[in-house]
Regions:
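Non-heme di-metal
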Residues: 1-129
Length: 129
């Protein structure tokens, strides 16, 4: 079982949005409208951790170790969207995604064998990086 050790490792490097980000040093005047819009689109895209997690839990129902890990993965992945939305709330509040915009990325993936589900996500992450 990998989850207990993974939990310890990930817990040790957890970051806090309020204390680990130097919000007061940000200069909103340096952000272009195009950059702010890109931040909004990324915040919406990152929100898709929710349907991805639902897919992983569904397709890996028989693997409690992996499903337990997904609880940490989802928490950390969702923070990506939240920190981008917090940035917008502070510096471009008119661009904070609406609940409807966030709901629009909640879609169902077709059921697939567990390894195919994982590869789909892994390939997507590599493509984005």
């Amino acid at each position: 079982m990998l989850y207990p050790e993974l939990f310890k490792q990930l817990e040790a490097v957890r970051w806090n949005m309020e204390t680990d980000i130097p919000w007061s040093s940000f200069d909103a005047t340096r952000l272009t409208d195009e950059q702010a819009t890109t931040i909004k689109m990324n915040a919406i895209t990152e929100w898709s951790a929710l349907p991805a997690t639902e897919m992983f839990l569904r397709d890996n129902r028989g693997d409690s170790d992996f499903c337990a890990f997904m609880s940490i993965w989802f928490f950390e992945e969702q923070k990506h969207s939240l920190v981008l939305m917090e940035y917008l709330r502070r510096f471009h509040p008119e661009l904070v995604p609406t609940e409807k915009e966030l709901d629009n990325v909640r879609f169902e993936f077709d059921p697939a064998p567990p390894l195919e589900t994982l590869m789909l996500h892994f390939c997507g992450e590599i493509r984005l990086n």
